[in-house]
């Protein structure tokens, strides 16, 4: 039959000696075997074991955390929309004990799943099974908070597993999303004519999460239903100019701005459209408000590309024109106004965009970013 030649694509990860694979460091390599004209290859993932104490210390050398978060009294606080945690295990079971301030929902993604499993998270402290009886070998489990910040906040107390491993590092691509109800998946699972509810809302079906998932990107979403850039309309005590400065709505410490996103996507102006209909004089003020916020975002993120979107629930020319003028006034080649061809949609609950439209926008945004 002849001699079988076995080689590794990266000997800093895996070496092959006398036909035996030897792990060198964490990472991924391709092992290729060839005999005569026949060949085969397989991917090999090398991960280090982790202890329960390491994982439950919530350090990102052992787990991945998505979105602004903080640790308080030994608990990992997940307030933000679509906050997520990725855990690595070596097969078997994984559970989490967490506390929720209100009825909410989670999506659980195992390995390369993109749809995930939706799980109801009632108010209070409970233990939840995230994965069970997985075959031996490395598995990545992501739990994502599918409910927006103003409806529920979570505290993670502890994870339990048969065998923890260090999770593989996140993507180098980082995207920050700033928005309103569109960005949180408000009513996205509901039908036109229905009222919005926690049950028919899901931020994992909104375009920011869809785009980040399509790009396998690290992400952070700062969004709040009903919010304006600086005006107070549906929300009487909060605007994005203030919310963006803080870790979260419940943790008002000044945010460190250490995420350093490659790309920032701002989607504001929809609530100002409604506000303007009741406060006509605001037309003269909006440009200055949006420009001031855009300038602050640039100040805190000097190297990021900034994409300003508008029109997913219809267009008011005064608002759209104000956003475009603010972008032009910045005179910054890394600030881009509305690069997508957006077809507005109001076919879901309370006249908000449906999942089908959100998914399409997310994919279009991902395609634009890739190009």
Predicted regions and their residues:
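Proline-centered loop/turn at the N-terminus of a beta-strand
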Residues: 174, 218, 304-305
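Alpha-helical cap/lid subdomain in secreted, periplasmic
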Residues: 244-371
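Conserved beta-strand segments of alpha/beta enzyme cores
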Residues: 5, 218-220, 334-337
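Conserved SGNH/GDSL esterase-like catalytic core that processes O-acyl groups on lipids
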Residues: 82, 149, 188, 193-280, ...
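Residues that act as N-cap/strand-start positions at coil-to-secondary-structure junctions
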Residues: 8, 15, 38, 79-81, ...
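N-terminal secretory targeting modules
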Residues: 47-178, 182-200
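Extracytoplasmic soluble-region selector
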Residues: 1-53
């Amino acid at each position: 039959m002849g001699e079988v030649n076995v080689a590794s694509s990266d000997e800093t990860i895996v070496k092959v000696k006398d036909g035996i694979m030897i792990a060198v460091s964490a990472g991924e390599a391709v092992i290729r075997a060839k005999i005569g004209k026949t060949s085969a290859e397989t991917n090999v993932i090398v991960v280090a074991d982790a202890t329960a104490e390491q994982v439950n210390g919530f350090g990102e050398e052992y787990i991945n955390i998505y979105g602004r978060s903080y640790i308080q009294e030994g608990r990992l606080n997940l307030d933000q929309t679509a906050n997520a945690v990725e855990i690595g295990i070596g097969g078997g079971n994984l559970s989490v004990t967490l506390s929720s301030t209100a009825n909410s929902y989670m999506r659980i993604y195992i390995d390369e799943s993109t749809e995930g499993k939706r799980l109801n998270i009632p108010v209070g402290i409970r233990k939840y099974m995230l994965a069970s009886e997985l075959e031996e070998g490395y598995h990545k489990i992501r739990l994502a908070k599918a409910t927006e910040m103003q409806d529920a906040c979570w505290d993670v107390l502890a994870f339990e597993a048969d065998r923890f491993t260090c999770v593989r590092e996140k993507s180098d691509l980082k995207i920050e999303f700033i928005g309103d109800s569109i960005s949180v998946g408000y009513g996205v699972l509901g039908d036109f004519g229905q009222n919005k509810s926690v049950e028919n809302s899901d931020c994992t079906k909104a375009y920011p999460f869809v785009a980040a998932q399509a790009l396998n990107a690290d992400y952070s979403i700062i969004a709040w239903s009903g919010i304006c850039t600086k005006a107070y309309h549906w929300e009487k005590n909060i605007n994005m100019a203030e919310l963006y400065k803080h870790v979260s709505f419940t943790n008002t410490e000044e945010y460190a701005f250490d995420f350093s996103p490659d790309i920032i996507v701002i989607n504001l102006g929809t609530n100002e459209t409604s506000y303007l209909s009741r406060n006509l004089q605001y037309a003269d003020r909006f440009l200055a408000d949006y420009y001031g916020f855009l300038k602050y975002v640039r100040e805190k993120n000097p190297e990021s590309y900034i994409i300003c979107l508008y029109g997913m629930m219809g267009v008011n020319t005064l608002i759209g024109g104000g956003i475009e003028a603010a972008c032009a006034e910045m005179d910054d080649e890394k600030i881009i106004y509305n690069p997508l061809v957006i077809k507005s949609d109001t076919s879901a609950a309370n006249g908000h965009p449906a999942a089908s439209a959100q998914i399409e926008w997310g994919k279009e945004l991902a395609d634009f970013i890739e190009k």
